[in-house]
Amino acid sequence: MKAIFFDVDFTLIHPGPRFAAEGYRSFGERHGLSVDTERFDAAVMAASQELEVDDDARYRPERFVRFGRRVIEEMGGRGPGLEACAREIYEEWAVCEHFSLYEDVKPALRRLHARGLLLGLISNTHRCLDAFQSHFALHPFISGAVSSSTQGFMKPHPSIFETALSALGVAADEAM
């Protein structure tokens, strides 16, 4: 084993309050939408189908905008501000300050790096992964990063993994 790749969202980082029920209420209010925060968990579950990758695995921002729109709709949000609200949610997802690193991430990356393993990131995000590494001080550990928004295809399309393997200079059987 020469390399280990990590996903970013919900593997290395988790969203803060901005992307919880009250955060979505605030998004809605800024766009003239009233939402019921009690419906947030069910809304996220219902909206999750919008994120499923179909046969066309190309990265399309609209998939994520639809997710935000659906969450707001499932929370009762209706009105002309819905589209702008969904787009703001999408844009804000890229802001590193809205996320926290899981507390075991740095120690784990440090240990793996010390063992001589190459570490990489593969993410279906539009967040700049260089900015992500800088914000969370991960540059010393990460040897390469590929996001679907810049590479063009979302996981599990083979090409995003091939791009990541190439970036680290390893073969598939040398990586996890």
Located regions from the model:
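Hydrophobic "anchor" residues on beta-strands that sit immediately upstream
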Residues: 3-5, 120, 176
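N-terminal helical cap/lid subdomain that shapes the substrate entry/recognition surface
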Residues: 1-103, 115
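Short acidic capping loops at alpha-helix termini that bridge into adjacent secondary structure
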Residues: 36-39, 140-144, 172-176
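Short, solvent-exposed loop/turn segments at secondary-structure junctions
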Residues: 11, 18-19, 126-128, 152
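Substrate-recognition element of Asp-dependent hydrolases with the DxDx(T/V) motif
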Residues: 83-134, 146-148
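Conserved Lys-Pro-Asp/Glu-containing loop-to-beta segment of HAD-superfamily phosphomonoesterases
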Residues: 154-176
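Short amphipathic alpha-helical segments
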Residues: 17-18, 133-135
